Amino acid sequence: MKKVVVGLSGGVDSSVAAASLHHQGYDVIGLTLWLMKGKGQCCSEGMVDAAFICEQLGVPHHIVDTRELFEANIINYLVSGYESGVTPLPCSQCNRAVKFGPMLAYAKEELNCDRIATGHYARIRYDEQTRRYQLLRAIDRNKDQSYFLYDLSQDILKGTIFPLGEQTKEETRRIAAEFDLKTASKPESQDLCLIEAHGSMASFLDQYIKPKEGEIVDLDGKVLGTHQGIHHYTIGQRKGLGIAAPEPLYVVKLDAVMNRVIVGNRAAGGRSDCTVGRLNWVSIAEPSSPITVEVQVRYRSKAVPVSIIPIENNRVTLQFNEPQFGITPGQAAVFYDGEIVLGGGIILQDNDSVK
């Protein structure tokens, strides 16, 4: 019998992933990662529900304490990023460094199993021509999570199953009801677990970053108002600025050195190019010459045409066909060729040369 370790969060998606594989004849072992300390009690509820699902399926359940790993790779990453004026994307880093990598290692070392599965909406296939595993968008584009998975390695793709990649969320709910799973009617969780635990990103960050009053200025340096910390703002933000102006104003830059929030009209927030670093080419070999593909610069944004020009230090320059609004340092730029995730990286600040 084929053995698989299924990552269980206690939600309906991972529950159906486990139940479906169990129904297909896999020897399923449930595994839940204990991620958060303190206020993150959503983890406690999730662990209880995950244990219940495993009991319902008649399969073993393991809990792995990854709180220190989560704090080092995610909490510290978020806090330092927001303090420096970027808007970090924790999910892709969490998937690589806290979830998939450690899960697969635990499965191999402790459970003698070389396959893991999760409830993510994405697909994996093997390309015989290139002899590489490819990461693909999910069939359900509304639930597609491939944007958050671009940083996975070939070894992880080889050892991973995404049972939900070929179905819609509605089908997942229906299957959960058919299996009479406890989580069948459980509400949809937040995309970001920290927001679910703390109510908002601002509430979470306020525990780590002290208020620091600064100026909100326009592009000419005219002071329009004040703020209590640049970590409360992100590029493209319009609401919550607390300033009066004859036209809508948006955050176009965060200056951590001067502790300033710089605002302008929508046209001022458009960019025709940007630099992306910390690259991972998940489905193809690293290109040595310019390529023209599509890029997605936010989870919910539309993929748009882009020219990717390799430069030094594991970085590329992105040149957009049309100016793009809200290009945000710290977020991921993920490259697509149709449904195939080619790779991606982190949008850098103009003065950031970090590899």
From Swiss-Prot:
Q: Where is this gene product found?
A: Cytoplasm
Q: Where is this region: Interaction with tRNA?
A: 143-145, 298-299
**Which Pfam family is an annotated match for this chain, by its short name?**
tRNA_Me_trans_C
> Which Cys pairs are S-S linked?
94-193
Q: Name one GO molecular function term.
A: tRNA-uridine 2-sulfurtransferase activity
Q: Which residues bind ATP?
A: 7-14, 33, 119
The answer to whether UniProt assigns keyword GTP-binding to this entry is no
Keyword annotations of the record: ATP-binding, Cytoplasm, Disulfide bond, Nucleotide-binding, RNA-binding, Transferase, tRNA processing, tRNA-binding
**Assigned EC number:** 2.8.1.13
Kindly state which reaction or reactions the protein catalyses: S-sulfanyl-L-cysteinyl-[protein] + uridine(34) in tRNA + AH2 + ATP = 2-thiouridine(34) in tRNA + L-cysteinyl-[protein] + A + AMP + diphosphate + H(+)
Q: Which Gene Ontology CC terms are recorded? A: cytoplasm
> Which GO terms of type biological process are on file?
tRNA wobble position uridine thiolation
Which protein are we looking at?
Answer: tRNA-specific 2-thiouridylase MnmA
